[in-house]
């Protein structure tokens, strides 16, 4: 009789151990990132911002991969975001110059023209050796030393705006130079540059992925308003992203305020193709 009681007690003890381990497993999973991808250029971790640091950092930790403006964060904050497994990509605008940057006065003479719909930006001459050197050896080094996991480079669309050979070669030189930091590179937009790179068999030697905005949505900058993309543009982008995928590039989408029905369509499209996407609330990317 005592032997049976002992066996029953051991059985319940084992059940309790299993239950405890399962509970611990669920708790651990709950703390790991739950969402795939987010672009948060409007979020800062600095003390002078209105939202408490911890609240912002916790929001970013909920993602497996985030794109941030590095100057909005300290290296310590980037380490904290990464602590639970989040990958942090640093934004770097290589094809345009913003008037709020501390180096604006140094390079404004090398700008080419105002950037439509973005009053604070100007297209840059990427063939300029001083601009190339600054991006590669100053900003590139600074951002990589902060502990980012990759670069998110904006405005290679300069090659669409100015389709000269020196612009194309200038972009290639910048990308080649940034490779010295051994970090993956994602290009935001730049489909004209990307497609030529693919055709010449150079894409994977220069960058690792592409992010395309507004495949399924579009922005009316006059309001602003967030709308569904027209069929022709959507078809063009889908064909372009298919080429990028076939070339071995990773593919990301950033959409703006897609409603629940459209979000389901985008989610299905991305699952079928192995893409990641982010549904931004607004242009502020917060």
Language model features: what each stretch is:
Residues 28-286:
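Glycan-processing catalytic domains of CAZymes
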Residues 8, 22-24, 31:
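Intrinsically disordered, low-complexity segments enriched in Ser/Pro/Gly/Ala and basic residues
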Residues 12-23:
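Bacterial N-terminal signal peptides
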Residues 10, 24-26, 145:
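Compositionally biased regions
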Residues 1-2, 26:
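Short, low-complexity interaction segments enriched in Ser/Thr/Pro/Gly
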